[in-house]
């Protein structure tokens, strides 16, 4: 990669976070933050073998928004370096059917997938002075569907927040990469039927790394990525589907 400074993965056990860590770790310290430090030993060993100068794990609960600033400060202290790449990869899919009747579950989805993301992105944009922040929107937020409107609404809100944050960071030396992937075939969606233009965590990570590399420099540019690229055309077609038909669309 050639990037200097520390790499922070918030959501260290996530499929996409792990793939990005593998591609961005060479020659730099890495901090893997997740809810509990278990389950990351294998990735830690792999990153060290791939050229990371050090790999630290950090317990982090996204729902504890009051701890977010302290988590970032602790990550920088563990790495012994300024954080120059931060990947916000935590999140939950939740259970749509349950959320329709259980307000606490609906709130949990909104908290982790929207409010906690806004909090963490705000802290990162305030603390970091250069480099890249990576956030994950989704095709699910492009137009809410009956089948997943709770999760989709969080992604719609997050996407809007990221567009504004990207404009705020323009010319600052810090850039925001907002990924809008389609259905991601991974551990979070295990057992679900893939949608058209589905992608794997590996494909998402490749696209994000390419965007980071293309925007490197003293004035990196923020970018929004449709992954895969043909998904952008499908997204615009989705906007044209009449609502009586749209409300019956599957996830």
List the model feature ranges, each with a label.
Residues 27-43:
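Conserved glycine-rich Rossmann-like NAD(P)H-binding loop of the short-chain dehydrogenase/reductase
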Residues 102-119, 158:
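Catalytic Tyr-X3-Lys loop
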Residues 121, 154:
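Active-site helix of classical SDR
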Residues 138:
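Residue(s) in the substrate-gating loop at a strand-loop-helix junction
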Residues 13-14:
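Conserved glycine-rich cofactor-binding loop
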Residues 73, 85, 91-107, 147:
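Conserved mid-core segment of classical short-chain dehydrogenase/reductases
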Residues 47-66:
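Rossmann-fold cofactor-recognition segment
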Residues 178, 193-236:
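C-terminal helical subdomain
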